[in-house]
């Protein structure tokens, strides 16, 4: 093999001028204008959305229906405006009161399509993180409600029955049906119950930030409607097969007494009853006070009486509509008009079962008996909470732990009190105290189990001394408590995802990953953690090992700085029985890296010995070029190791696009891994990020090139030509035969070679990231000079075509699998939707 020449390490990318016809732009203008007229949108928001749409369309290739991208632009513009209200001086609501569901209807766009496209739009439009967080919250809230409605449908069918003269679950009838005025029909009963729940959960959003609490609230609403049906003696609406019915409910002299059916549908009955007596009653009292509902305030009956039912349904609808317009969320009433089972796309996109990480699969308990059933998020979350609640009776350290002495225990309780105050200050829910109490109970249980296991493993050690040593270890107690809090948050399916606990308690990921293995070992062996929770712990440990622990401010870099370089290899850390924290950390990193290399090589159908060679390249990057991991992701280095091996070996396949496709099939895969790779720190102190092509070409190859060549025994050939190590995201252009343009004429087109193209004496060159902006402006003026100028109105932004023509240089999709031998310093790569590109280069016109 020939040794690669450093001069031939460039990544070829073609930047082209994609001209957009005036007719096409005129059609877009007209379609956008008509869409805004249908929505009755204000002019300012309309212009703002259109400008954003044009700006993004100039930079990115927007595939699919244009109206769908317009929908994203309009929604973004609407959410970033405020509308004055008449409720008080200077009072405003966020948004311009354009309904999201109405917007989707006008754009002929499904909820599933919107949820997918709006996330891509956030990336393409470079929207602020605050807005991205709002979109994630919107997505998550709807996913929870979608799953709850599926349970709602099942429970309602168990309790109530549809009279023979009514159509059950007819589409749209619940929104537009005609029924006898004043009398509650089966479909309207379904409507009022679902709307009552929607209004109740929005009344106190902080109380329903998790799946389990929202489910309990929904059961409380169903319980209330059930009692009202019994009180009105609407036996025609009751399912006689329901097990929770009073024994004498069919008798003529039946008198209704408060009857609770929570135990029929809640595994955690006490928690649901506590909510019914406190939070739910407070919400209903506020509804009566605000005249949102009418009936007997004390007994909460009479909601379905002929004189109250219609106005209650109307009032709940108005209240919910006002809320939806003010927050810009999906109108979740539409779920009443559809069968959730028909929406396979939404089912796939809703709350999914936890993925199985590659590491520590042997610690997972056996699949439960119902494992063959379809994953049910509500049941899974309830089971998780129920399992942790079994330890809720433990309110203080066990007698075994107390043997450490009063002074040590007092210090331990002081640490826990300090942690609790931090949690209560940052957890956005009135349930914060009960959540932490559950975590604290589990902490006391785990602490007892861990210390007793230590005694069993070291029977000769002094008990008192061991207890004092362990219980007094501050970082051990803090990380163990944080791990218990994380388990409780995961069990309830709250919106606060890892690494929130690290920020809450100011813990480094390097310190936190130490405790996870201990918790998993004792939790799985004692049976206090089920399969789902252990999967979660394994997953967040991998997150620490792959990314968080390698952050610039991580304590691991202090240890690396004081260690003897190069860092120990896989063999060294496994032979060292007296390994320290750094060695144990590297042992976990090496194992994780090896498992992922094996998985990717298997997906790529590489030969059996290939993973070992790639492993040695990866190991060298950790031991000798450790800086490659600083502020970066393990998978970024693994993908680069695979590709540099392929390039040195001169293999035709797989391409880099194949590597990325295989990576996207991994359980831990996220797009940001190849879209946003840390490069350097800017002058203003902010991190500079580029795509993985730039990182591979300009950072990875210069550091790893010589080692890979030496390790794989690449030698120069006679001609002295070199292979190309570096990555080209542009497809390889193969020589093609002359192509016949049409069958009716003997007209052929053949490709010109590069040396046939005559250079223009008046050429203009613009180098991205290097040339000043005025050069690009001059180039654009040159291009626009020969174009006809059409005026369609006096309105700025939408009227003058000259101002909105997309004659600027447009980005071309960069596909990362071309092995052409071109210099990266002479070409440029640009990112588009769903792909990545390299650094800027030159463009001629």
From Swiss-Prot:
Region (Domain A): 376-560
Cellular-component GO terms for this entry: chromatin; DRM complex; Myb complex; nucleoplasm; nucleus; Rb-E2F complex; transcription regulator complex
Keyword Transcription regulation applies: yes
Post-translational modification: Phosphorylation by cyclin E-dependent kinases appears to negatively regulate RBF activity.
Stored SUPFAM superfamilies: Cyclin-like
Region annotated Domain B, chain positions: 580-706
GO biological process, alphabetically ordered: cell differentiation; chromosome organization; DNA endoreduplication; eggshell chorion gene amplification; endomitotic cell cycle; intrinsic apoptotic signaling pathway in response to DNA damage; maintenance of mitotic sister chromatid cohesion; negative regulation of apoptotic process
Disordered: annotated segments: 720-742, 817-845
Any one GO molecular function term: transcription cis-regulatory region binding
Tree of life domain: Eukaryota
Major site of localization recorded for this protein: nucleus
Modified residues (Phosphoserine): 760, 771
Phosphothreonine carried by residues: 356, 359
Keywords: Activator, Cell cycle, DNA-binding, Nucleus, Phosphoprotein, Repressor, Transcription, Transcription regulation
Pocket: annotated span: 376-706
Subcellular location: Nucleus
Transmembrane regions listed in the UniProt entry: none
Homology family: Belongs to the retinoblastoma protein (RB) family.
Subunit structure of this chain's protein: Forms a complex with the DRTF1/E2F transcription factor through binding to a C-terminal region of E2F. This binding inhibits the E2F-mediated transactivation activity. Component of the DREAM complex at least composed of Myb, Caf1-55, mip40, mip120, mip130, E2f2, Dp, Rbf, Rbf2, lin-52, HDAC1/Rpd3 and l(3)mbt.
Function per UniProt: Functions in cell cycle regulation. Component of the DREAM complex, a multiprotein complex that can both act as a transcription activator or repressor depending on the context. In follicle cells, the complex plays a central role in the site-specific DNA replication at the chorion loci. During development, the complex represses transcription of developmentally controlled E2F target genes.
Protein name: Retinoblastoma family protein
UniProt source species: Drosophila melanogaster (Fruit fly)
Gene: Rbf
